[in-house]
């Protein structure tokens, strides 16, 4: 089951692609955000003859699962793989050149904002109903500027 943020992430990706006719979605699979689900789902798509140029995953564990399937089929080096989270494992894969990028979230910042919002609610203060927290795209060009063992 996807949470609203996951559904919004997927919808935003699809909406953005719809604005660019050079790109098309050739396959979709639900990984439930889990590596162990993403790998067989990606394998199934590949066995159906769906060979992507790029794979956009719900999160970094899904990206790692998709990468494992692509590797088994000899396609990882030919496929751009994107994840979301900025997980240490994803940053390591980016550093090694196996993964293309991850949109790094900051669990620390998310926790701070959540605590501030709960505090405001409990004190009867005004609070933002919708909060956007910026992310950073981690690529091979900037991955060394991040803590490889931790989160942002």
Where in the sequence are the language-model features?
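Short beta-strand elements at the ligand-binding edges of bilobed clamshell
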Residues: 28, 96-108
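A general structural signal for well-ordered alpha-helical segments in protein cores
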Residues: 10, 63, 111-115
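Extracytoplasmic "Venus flytrap"
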Residues: 3-8, 59-60
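Conserved beta-strand scaffold positions in the cores of enzyme catalytic domains, especially
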Residues: 25-28, 81, 102, 130, ...
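Flexible loop/hinge segments that line or gate small-molecule binding clefts
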Residues: 76, 85-100, 138-151
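Hinge/cleft segment of the Venus flytrap/periplasmic-binding protein
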Residues: 1, 5, 16-20, 106-152
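Hydrophobic alpha-helical
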Residues: 12-13, 24-27, 31-92
